Amino acid sequence: DVAPSRGLGDVYKRQLVLPYNDIDAIEDAFEKMGNEIAGVIIEPVAGNMGVVPPKDGYLQKIREITKKYGSVFIVDEVMTGFRLSASGAIGRFGLDADIVTFGKIIGGGMPVGAYGGKREIMEFVSPTGPVYQAGTLSGNPLAMAAGNAQIKYLQENPYIYEEIEQKGAYLESEFKKSAEKYGVNVRVNRVGSMMSVFFTDNDVTNFETASKSNTEKFKVYFNEMLKQGIYLAPSQFESLFLSDAHTKADLEKTAAAFDKVMEILR
C-alpha cells in the first residue's frame, strides 16, 4: 500500500505484489481478477532478496495461467540472462516468455539495457508501431560492440557454463561443510553462478523467509571475509556471483576464509 518512491502517483495502486514461489497466490489473483491483469513480471531466479530459486514447476505454471487469461508473461533476465546459460533462465527452465528484459552481461561490462519479445508485441514499437521508444545513447556503438563481443565469446565457448557450474557446486559444498562443522545455522541457495548465504535455520523460498535471516551475523560474515581479501556484496539480500575468471586458488581461498568466519560465529 506504500509507493516505493515519490512521483509515482497512483500507478503503484494498480499493481499486485505477490509472494515468490507461491503458486496458490497467483491462481487466487487470476481467479478474482484475471481479466484485469495485463501482465506478470518475474525474476526467474530471485536475486534481490538474496538468491531464491524457483520451486519445481512454479514458472511453468505461471506461464500456463497467463496464457489461459491472455496476460503477458514478462521474464526479468537482467541478472540471469546469459549468466545461467547461453539462452538465460528461459532456456535453463524451458520457458515460453512473451517479453524478456536484459542488462548487465549483455553489455559486456558496459551499461546496457534491452528488451525483446514476440513479434505480435514488438510490432507495436516504433517505427512499425505507435509506441515510441528511443534515447540519446540508445544503440551506443561502444556498448553494442562490447555486448556483441561478450555474447559471441559465450556462444563460441559453451564449456564456460559447465565450468562455472562446477565452481559454484564446489563453493556451495565447502560453505555447507564449514557451517555444519561449527554448528552455524545457514542456508546456502545457489543456481549456477548465483549464490547467497542466509543466516537462518529455515529454508529460504521467498522474501518473507529471507527477511528472517540474522543480518547481524551477516555483518560479521561480510567484515571478516573482507579482512581476508574476499569482497562480497554488502547486503544479506544480494547475490554472490562467480565467473570464469575465478581460479581454483580463488575458490580455495574463499572457502578457507568462510571456514574461519564460521569458527568465529559458532
PLM feature spans:
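Conserved N-terminal phosphate-binding loop of PLP-dependent enzymes in the Aspartate aminotransferase
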Residues: D10-R266
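Single conserved hydrophobic/aromatic residue that forms the stacking wall/gate
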Residues: D1-Y12
